[in-house]
Amino acid sequence: MASYPSGSGKPKAKYPFKKRASLQASTAAPEARGGLGAPPLQSARSLPGPAPCLKHFPLDLRTSMDGKCKEIAEELFTRSLAESELRSAPYEFPEESPIEQLEERRQRLERQISQDVKLEPDILLRAKQDFLKTDSDSDLQLYKEQGEGQGDRSLRERDVLEREFQRVTISGEEKCGVPFTDLLDAAKSVVRALFIREKYMALSLQSFCPTTRRYLQQLAEKPLETRTYEQGPDTPVSADAPVHPPALEQHPYEHCEPSTMPGDLGLGLRMVRGVVHVYTRREPDEHCSEVELPYPDLQEFVADVNVLMALIINGPIKSFCYRRLQYLSSKFQMHVLLNEMKELAAQKKVPHRDFYNIRKVDTHIHASSCMNQKHLLRFIKRAMKRHLEEIVHVEQGREQTLREVFESMNLTAYDLSVDTLDVHADRNTFHRFDKFNAKYNPIGESVLREIFIKTDNRVSGKYFAHIIKEVMSDLEESKYQNAELRLSIYGRSRDEWDKLARWAVMHRVHSPNVRWLVQVPRLFDVYRTKGQLANFQEMLENIFLPLFEATVHPASHPELHLFLEHVDGFDSVDDESKPENHVFNLESPLPEAWVEEDNPPYAYYLYYTFANMAMLNHLRRQRGFHTFVLRPHCGEAGPIHHLVSAFMLAENISHGLLLRKAPVLQYLYYLAQIGIAMSPLSNNSLFLSYHRNPLPEYLSRGLMVSLSTDDPLQFHFTKEPLMEEYSIATQVWKLSSCDMCELARNSVLMSGFSHKVKSHWLGPNYTKEGPEGNDIRRTNVPDIRVGYRYETLCQELALITQAVQSEMLETIPEEAGITMSPGPQ
């Protein structure tokens, strides 16, 4: 694909608007340029003031990779394009051997021996005594003293907790099992990666793990602001509040009159270089100024991607992270051996609470396939009996009734069965995403999909609304099951949002057990080939301009304004295994110049979705409206750099299977506690057999994972697909009751339900760290398990932050001596 650097070959577009005075030059690293000898792309716009990443790095986090990040990243991108059939990728460990090169192990052993020889005899004696300790009380006391002052946690509750379960402690000079030099390089790189994620979460008002933030603040001058739940004066929930939130007094779509909407801000909107800009006048001209709304700088984003790409293939860092992950797995197995009976006893002491009546959220499920195949079959038969003469379709300008549609297929209600419906995935869909997509068409006919599971059709989505409401009714009847349904916005026309919101409001499709996410399929190449879009920026305008308009002037989109209050965020969906023919860098065409029929890469979609969402979130927060998060499909298949982009930009992800091949990324996802909604039954039919699914491994190591169904229409058989998912996972992997309840609690924590609702479901203190944030009366998760997870995470974070701090203390005298006598000019 042709590239269009902004500095040459194409004149830069001029816009007759005043730039705001607070903008400063980009501070991205020089290696972020698109290619050798080519001028850098003109930065779209940076945040006001210094770049957050540099402002937030008071320490020297430079490593030996810093000057080579761009070259390493480009080489890895090239390999992912040209060598997709490699048996062992450069960023992963082969399954048969934990270490790729035995030479690396030999050199590491030699370094370890050389360091041990230099130890003094008294140090050796002390290390031996520490190793032979059998009583861990002193270690626990030391750990408790080191943790004092890091928060306002109650010491009494902590003392009680320490007596409740058995701990395993590691003593000695080098507790991590690698030489200090390797630990220092790995710690600096991991801390740098966590700072990068914190910066982008703060920029978009998404959440960031509070425990991780607290440890990073020890290394930073000023903490960044991230998304937090704020309690208003009328929202506090008492400790004895009921588990079920109070019912709404009226339907949320009751008042849809424009006169009841918030006022008009009178701001102007225009998309520039792929991002919506907001101006002080409705019709922007040379006399208006730009409203200060931050979004990520493109040059800085590419530089950050290069840093992370170089990080995940660094040999010593890869070995360090692999060792830490193996340690976490072994430590959890030891914890289970020592405390399993205590956890079970703690659960049995709680009255009227078990796995069946704790809150569970299906955090990854598509609305068009949220029903099982028997449910859809019964609904179609019922529609054929009651609405046979209703006009439901237009074929070549001719209206057709439901009777005529089925007569053209030579079918009657009696002929229909689950087998003729043919919507269930089978062995032929494995690694065939095209055949899986065809399963969305009942009886193989796209016309039936349009009639029954589409929101925009001849009957205004009436049938789809009815079947969704039946699914909602089943969820409400179960009380404790909830779902976050995905609805699609394609970006082909500007009125898609209004049609979707009108469908929800007109048919009153709402339930307290359901929240919405909006998925954007990555299908620009299809629309461009059909001539439906002129360039990629037109697709972005169709997706985001209506949202900005509904935020600036809600009365202009009344249904959309009401609907958005129940939308959690955005999802990016499509087949990740499709080859990408382009690498996203500074030489990539801007959205208005992307007119090729090739599809933009995954990172391109994610960056421009994130940039517009960040601007929109700041505007909506100023108005007191609900903000959004980014929760894409990621890591199901395809190249590993999808997970790199999601680590930087996404609050949660769905699938994450490829993390099993990337120990550095898996360790980073653990430290940042990024939510991962996993669907083993879906993966079993498409990409990975059930027994190879990494979910039990992720869970044992402490990653924030939950179970989800993905597509019950294709993969499940029962009326309760989420319970079916839990049931099979428990039987196959022999999960304990505590494991199941922990998965359910994780699903609520990573969901988009409101703070008040979560306070009822999990307890009013659920935002606190550690066991203080757990209420076993509501979650059925023992404080023992929550305390273990919290202490283990704190120990891992302390390991890397203390290594960085110790290196900083050692270099302070040298740096002070250098700066006191300035060198020659």
From Swiss-Prot:
- Please list the residues that make up the active site: 655 (proton acceptor)
Q: Which residues bind Zn(2+)?
A: 364, 366, 633, 710
Q: What is its EC number?
A: 3.5.4.6
Question: Which stretches of sequence are listed as region Disordered?
Answer: 1-49
Q: Where is the composition biased (Basic residues)?
A: 11-21
Can you provide one Gene Ontology molecular function annotated for this UniProt record?
identical protein binding
- One term under GO cellular component: cytosol
Recorded catalytic activity of this chain's protein: AMP + H2O + H(+) = IMP + NH4(+)
Q: Which Pfam families match?
A: AMP_deaminase (PF19326)
Q: Which residues carry this modification: Phosphothreonine?
A: 134
**Cofactor note text:** Binds 1 zinc ion per subunit.
Q: Which GO terms describe its biological process?
A: AMP metabolic process; ATP metabolic process; cholesterol homeostasis; cyclic purine nucleotide metabolic process; energy homeostasis; GTP metabolic process; IMP biosynthetic process; IMP salvage
Query: What EC class is this?
Result: hydrolase
Instruction: Please give the InterPro entries that the UniProt record associates with this protein.
Output: A/AMP_deam_AS, AMPD, Metal_Hydrolase
Q: Where are the transmembrane segments?
A: none
**Which tissues is it found in, per the record?**
Highly expressed in cerebellum.
**Taxonomic superkingdom:** Eukaryota
Spell out the NCBIfam families in the cross-references.
AMP_deaminase
Its assembly, as annotated, is: Homotetramer.
- Disease named in the record: Pontocerebellar hypoplasia 9: A form of pontocerebellar hypoplasia, a disorder characterized by structural defects of the pons and cerebellum, evident upon brain imaging. PCH9 features include severely delayed psychomotor development, progressive microcephaly, spasticity, seizures, and brain abnormalities, including brain atrophy, thin corpus callosum, and delayed myelination. Spastic paraplegia 63, autosomal recessive: A form of spastic paraplegia, a neurodegenerative disorder characterized by a slow, gradual, progressive weakness and spasticity of the lower limbs. Rate of progression and the severity of symptoms are quite variable. Initial symptoms may include difficulty with balance, weakness and stiffness in the legs, muscle spasms, and dragging the toes when walking. In some forms of the disorder, bladder symptoms (such as incontinence) may appear, or the weakness and stiffness may spread to other parts of the body.
**Which protein, by its recorded name, is this?**
AMP deaminase 2
Q: Which gene encodes it?
A: AMPD2
